[in-house]
């Protein structure tokens, strides 16, 4: 099924609905998208890309050339337009000595789909623009409720679902960022101990660009019955990206990553998942499949995939973890 059909949600037999004129997106193959790079310089080395990519993600310098340089150029245009609008509004309001608030980029997608790699690659590319902007990266992991809270509320098996996050804290953080406040605290998370680290924070001090990455960042909220105003996390985004792939592919990537972690991080006695390091491969495969089916697949279908049409840009991956198609929202 084509990305156009999936986004619109109609059968492929309805060819007239696949026309771009009936879609809010422009669609490009990776080869077409690569041509939009123009003269954007390649500022990363092969070794740097290897350092930035997540376990199991084969992204290389060629993929950066094909996909990310064009994306960097596009984001540069959006940031420049935002700066121009900021200046025009200040003139309209007769304001002076006003500091522009950060340009916020949201990145969403399933677990194991490659969000973190995309976020880290973009952080480096954007920070190396000629204007040398200050770029920060924050993930939503730190905004999960602590395990003690999840255990008390019987939500440990729902970790990663919307109710497992402190959404109010996310909104306070993004509101402070968009208000232009200095030294905003973002809670830290440890994948080793699988928990929020108490009293540990990353300080975000008025960056030019903030990348905010997590599975839940494009999700909407139920409107309260009392009529109170409820902001959405995505209300604070200037641009949003969804990393997409077929379910069976993400399943394979998730299981492969789980098995590799058994040979690496899980062997650390301090790891929350240390118990999985000593079981048989067959047992590990069964556990990984169960975790995928009963937790991550459900979350993908119920809460993550439905947010895809809300993204400004959709990067669709193929079975080799490399991006095959790009959808860009029309203006």
From Swiss-Prot:
Its recorded reaction(s) are: (R)-pantothenate + ATP = (R)-4'-phosphopantothenate + ADP + H(+)
Could you tell me the Gene Ontology terms of the biological process aspect for this record? coenzyme A biosynthetic process
Q: Which GO terms describe its molecular function?
A: ATP binding; pantothenate kinase activity
Its localization reads:
Cytoplasm
Q: Name one Pfam family in it.
A: PRK
Q: Which cysteines are joined by disulfide bonds?
A: none
- Give the protein family: Belongs to the prokaryotic pantothenate kinase family.
**What name goes with this protein?**
Pantothenate kinase
* Organism name: Rhizobium etli (strain CIAT 652)
């Amino acid at each position: 099924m084509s990305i156009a059909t999936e986004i619109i949600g109609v059968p492929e037999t309805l060819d007239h609905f696949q026309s771009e004129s009936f879609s809010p997106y422009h669609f490009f193959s990776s080869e077409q998208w690569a041509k939009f790079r123009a003269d954007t310089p390649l500022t990363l080395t092969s070794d740097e890309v290897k350092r930035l990519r997540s376990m199991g993600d084969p992204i290389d310098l060629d993929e950066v050339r094909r996909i990310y340089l064009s994306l960097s150029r596009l984001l540069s245009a959006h940031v420049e337009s935002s700066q121009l609008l900021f200046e025009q509004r200040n003139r309209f309001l007769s304001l002076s000595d006003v500091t522009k608030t950060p340009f916020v980029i949201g990145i969403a997608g399933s677990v194991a789909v490659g969000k973190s790699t995309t976020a880290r690659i973009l952080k480096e590319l954007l920070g190396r623009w000629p204007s040398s902007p200050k770029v920060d990266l924050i993930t939503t992991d730190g905004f999960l409720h602590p395990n003690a809270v999840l255990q008390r509320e019987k939500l440990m098996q729902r970790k990663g679902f919307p109710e497992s996050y402190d959404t109010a804290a996310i909104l306070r953080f993004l509101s402070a960022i968009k208000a232009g406040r200095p030294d905003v605290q973002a809670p830290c998370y440890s994948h080793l101990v699988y928990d929020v680290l108490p009293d540990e924070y990353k300080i975000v001090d008025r960056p030019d660009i903030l990348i905010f990455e997590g599975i839940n960042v494009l999700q909407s909220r139920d409107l309260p019955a009392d009529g109170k105003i409820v902001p959405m996390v995505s209300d604070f985004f200037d641009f949003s990206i969804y990393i997409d792939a077929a379910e069976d592919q993400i399943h394979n990537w998730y299981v492969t990553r789980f098995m590799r972690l058994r040979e690496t991080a899980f062997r650390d006695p301090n790891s929350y998942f240390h118990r999985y390091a000593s079981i048989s491969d067959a047992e590990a495969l069964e556990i990984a499949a169960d975790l995928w089916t009963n937790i991550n697949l459900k979350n993908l279908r119920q809460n993550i995939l439905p947010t895809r049409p809300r993204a400004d840009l959709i990067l669709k991956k193929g079975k080799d973890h490399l991006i095959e198609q790009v959808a860009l929202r029309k203006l």
